[in-house]
Amino acid sequence: MTAVLPLALTAAACSRPPEQQFLTQFFRAARARDNTTLAMMSAVSLDPREQGTVEDFTITSVTPENRTPLDLKSLLEAERQARDAESEFAKRKMEYQNANLPVIEQVVKLERDPKARLTPAQQVVKAAWDKWREDSATYTRAVSAARAAVVDATGPAEASLTQPGQPPFDPSAFTGEMVSKDVVLDAEIRNPQGQTAPATLTVTMTRAVGTLGGEAREGRWIITRIAGV
């Protein structure tokens, strides 16, 4: 019997999902508010002061890995085009402004007075200037949206691939995909008031896989979503 026991213990240890150790370390760091460790493991926060802490958990299921191509180059190109379009528009707007500056200044001043009456010439310039200002906001929003798309796409990939001793992440030189899986947990959550209750959590783990500057790279797993807490 004594010879069988170590084998049984080994089998039990081996039956633990590989995600168990990773999540145990993450929840421990969250309880301790170890921000350095958390930053290396997760792109989302789990603040004990707001969401509580995971005191214990059991993994009930892990979904198959899902692979999504990560086309950063097209996103970077879209951002470049948006910035170029905004720059060209700003140039044309400045040309109009310089050509009509005295009247524009009059219009801007009169806009502050609700009782002011514009001359026909001022009304023409005001209509044109309103359109320039409206279009300017449209171009600004387009650049912001393009930039946000780049940040949203590169953030998890950069976090996954940024490792000691490895070259820095260059989104323009990366070709590959994001690999993700959902880990479902039965957890015991202690809320900020100190009360403990069961909860079902779904933790999404993601990593980047591909080539960076022609060199094969495989990123570490990071947490990109925690649902249920």
Question: Can you name each region flagged by the protein language model?
Answer:
Residues N66-E77, R83:
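Alpha-helical linker/edge segments of TPR/alpha-solenoid repeat scaffolds
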Residues A8-A11, R112:
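N-proximal short alpha-helices
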Residues M1-P6, A13-L70, P167-V229:
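C-terminal or late-domain output modules
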Residues R80-V229:
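Exposed beta-sheet edge and beta->alpha loop/turn motif
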Residues A11, L38, S42, P69-S74, ...:
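Generic alpha-helix signal with a bias toward terminal, lower-confidence helices
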